[in-house]
């Protein structure tokens, strides 16, 4: 029995990440090889031609799972009936811009898109915010879409999570699929805390802690953390543009695990609405370790937190509280 198509919105679809993400969705990478999709692509009016070109390419690729395409600059049309919304569109920080300027631009974007989603999206729409500042954009979206359940509004830290797994696999010369349960705590920014204290590697003699195998606490507590924190900047330096392919791939991972579930014994990182777990202030969108089942995420509870971790977790929470204050000041 063929499944009903799911409607997936990508905002900022004509941009770099959109160009990498849209074919992944159309191929079934995000929702599964048996799940038909109807793509809704939104961008701003100056990108109309580019958006139409993307639509032409999607037609030309003849994706079997792609059952329809809505390409539009109208936010209401874009949001109507969508089951999944991936918010890639935002206002990027340009040289010489103050953080407050960027924040106020994004606050107005996310305020209007929140209203459109609230009024027109499918009832249990799942939202993933990718555009920076991702955690705070997601918080604004939550504020202005009160009827969307708060558990349905998330932000992307899976890219950082995957970067952490990648660094460990390179260091130990193992397959990345054999590394699991790294954690990204906090903000999708350079204050995030990549934590390996609970991470393990599959070896011929069973699962072993990453700390034990790396056997270099100095590296794990300094270079590993800063490499993951600064990876986005390193890619901009190398490519002269921001990471698009890896961001798109991790957005698919985030939604796929959320919708289809995480493997037994594995947790992943998602930016979700804090309930006060691990002493993180409630009312922030903060990256936690989660497991997913039946289309719902649950924060992994009871992990021991050492003093080193506590400081880092508090520092990134502090930054998020400051961003929240800044964002709210832009509303007035």
UniProtKB/Swiss-Prot annotation:
Tell me the compartments it is located in.
Cytoplasm
Protein name, please? Malate dehydrogenase, cytoplasmic
- Its signal peptide is none
Predominant location of this chain?
cytoplasm
Q: Which family does it belong to?
A: Belongs to the LDH/MDH superfamily. MDH type 2 family.
Residues that bind oxaloacetate, according to the entry? Answer: 99, 132, 163, 188, 243
Enzyme active site: 188
Alphabetized PANTHER family for the sequence: MALATE DEHYDROGENASE
Q: Pfam families annotated for this entry? A: Ldh_1_C (PF02866), Ldh_1_N (PF00056)
Q: What are the UniProt keywords, alphabetically?
A: Cytoplasm, NAD, Oxidoreductase, Phosphoprotein, Tricarboxylic acid cycle
On subunit structure and binding partners, the annotation says: Homodimer.
A Gene Ontology molecular-function term?
A: L-malate dehydrogenase (NAD+) activity
- Report the enzyme's class at the first EC level: oxidoreductase
Q: Which organism is it from?
A: Oryza sativa subsp. japonica (Rice)
Q: Which NCBIfam families match?
A: MalateDH-SF1, MDH_euk_cyt, PRK05442.1
């Amino acid at each position: 029995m063929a499944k009903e198509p799911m409607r997936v919105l990508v905002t900022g679809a004509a941009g770099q990440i959109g160009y990498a993400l849209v074919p992944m969705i159309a191929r079934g990478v995000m929702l599964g090889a048996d799940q038909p999709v109807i793509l809704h692509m939104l961008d701003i009016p100056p990108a109309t031609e580019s958006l139409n070109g993307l639509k032409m390419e999607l037609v030309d690729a003849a994706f079997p799972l792609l059952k329809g395409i809505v390409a539009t600059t109208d936010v209401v049309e874009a949001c109507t009936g969508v089951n999944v919304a991936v918010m890639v569109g935002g206002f990027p920080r340009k040289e010489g811009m103050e953080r407050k300027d960027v924040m106020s631009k994004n606050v107005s974007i996310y305020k209007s898109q929140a209203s459109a989603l609230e009024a027109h999206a499918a009832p249990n729409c799942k939202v993933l915010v990718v555009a920076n500042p991702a955690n705070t954009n997601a918080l604004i979206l939550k504020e202005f879409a009160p009827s969307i359940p708060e558990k349905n509004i998330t932000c992307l830290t899976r890219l950082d999570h995957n970067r952490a797994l990648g660094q460990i696999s390179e260091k130990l010369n193992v397959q990345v699929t054999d590394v699991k349960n790294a954690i990204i705590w906090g903000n999708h920014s350079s204050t995030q805390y990549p934590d390996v204290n609970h991470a393990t590697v599959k070896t011929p003699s069973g699962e072993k802690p990453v700390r034990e195998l790396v056997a270099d606490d100095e590296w794990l507590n300094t270079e590993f953390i800063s490499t993951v924190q600064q990876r986005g900047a390193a890619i901009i330096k190398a490519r002269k543009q921001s990471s698009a392919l890896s961001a798109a791939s991790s957005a698919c991972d985030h939604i796929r695990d959320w919708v289809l579930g995480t493997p037994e014994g594995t947790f992943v990182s998602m930016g979700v609405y804090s309930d006060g777990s691990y002493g993180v202030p409630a009312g922030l969108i903060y990256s936690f370790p989660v497991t997913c089942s039946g289309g719902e995420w649950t924060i992994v509870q009871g992990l021991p937190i050492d003093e080193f971790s506590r400081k880092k977790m508090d520092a990134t929470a502090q930054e998020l509280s400051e961003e929240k204050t800044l964002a709210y000041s832009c509303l007035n």
